[in-house]
Amino acid sequence: MERYENLFAQLNVRREGAFVPFVTLGDPGIEQSLKIIDTLIDAGADALELGVPFSDPLADGPTIQNANLRAFAAGVTPTQCFEMLALIREKHPTIPIGLLMYANLVFNNGIDAFYAHCEKVGVDSVLVADVPVEESAPFRQAALRHNIAPIFICPPNADDDLLRQIASYGRGYTYLLSRSGVTGAENRGALPLHHLIEKLKEYHAAPALQGFGISSPVQVSAAVRAGAAGAISGSAIVNIIEKNHNTSPDQMLAELKSFVYAMKAASRV
């Protein structure tokens, strides 16, 4: 959890927002996936948000569903994902690493065992996408026992009660939804969300990172200007992987590098 605190403190001093890319572990294969993640970090990513392949990702649109399918086609398992996480942590000791999960994967070997494994490989946070705040107690308690930040989604229609719960239970960062629905770069994020950001700050919530539909530098800049601590982009990045992974892996890495570089540059406002 301290890695998030350190990151946000450093970014505040530099007057920057965080840019956080999302990719699915093992997409389109383990070796390529590790190269992709190295490229994202080298291009300026401040933290990572990583998915573990899942057969029914309810919160995700077709782009990230396809990423899951590519990882499954490559035979990637949760065990291999944890091996990848250990390698990423060893190579990049200071970057915050977050997982975006679904509850079935957490339940597989028991909730406590899952978070213990996360701690062992150097994960900093876990967002369980299909567990609402009011049902989160066993997850967040296990997370805190193992020094993992429990992350909560703040929807655009959050009422005061929910905002207070998110502020009370969340650690690391708060995932602020640009809009309701599923992920997807084609579903543009409705920017900005001043009122929610102000309320989250008033209730001393973990810093807000805006996600869903973030696909251009202009949106990153707008999120930071609205008071968010940064932005998360997934589908736009996964689109680059989908477009190039079969035909031109080198072109894919070059495009990813320039995309992340531009998105990070936009966080400096």
Swiss-Prot record:
* Protein family (similarity comment): Belongs to the TrpA family.
Q: Report the pathway entry.
A: Amino-acid biosynthesis; L-tryptophan biosynthesis; L-tryptophan from chorismate: step 5/5
Which gene is the coding source of this polypeptide chain? trpA
Species source reads Salmonella arizonae (strain ATCC BAA-731 / CDC346-86 / RSK2980)
Q: Name one GO molecular function term.
A: tryptophan synthase activity
Name used for this protein in its record: Tryptophan synthase alpha chain
Sorted alphabetically, which HAMAP family does this protein's record hold?
Trp_synth_alpha
One Pfam family named in its UniProt record:
Trp_syntA
List the EC numbers from the record: 4.2.1.20
> Mind telling me which NCBIfam families this protein's record contains?
trpA
Q: Where is the catalytic site?
A: 49 (proton acceptor), 60 (proton acceptor)
Q: Which reaction does it catalyse?
A: (1S,2R)-1-C-(indol-3-yl)glycerol 3-phosphate + L-serine = D-glyceraldehyde 3-phosphate + L-tryptophan + H2O
Its EC top class is lyase
How it assembles, according to the record, is: Tetramer of two alpha and two beta chains.
Give any Gene Ontology cellular component: cytosol
Superkingdom, natural source: Bacteria
- Kindly indicate whether the keyword Amino-acid biosynthesis belongs to this entry: yes
Biological function: The alpha subunit is responsible for the aldol cleavage of indoleglycerol phosphate to indole and glyceraldehyde 3-phosphate.
Keywords per UniProt: Amino-acid biosynthesis, Aromatic amino acid biosynthesis, Lyase, Tryptophan biosynthesis
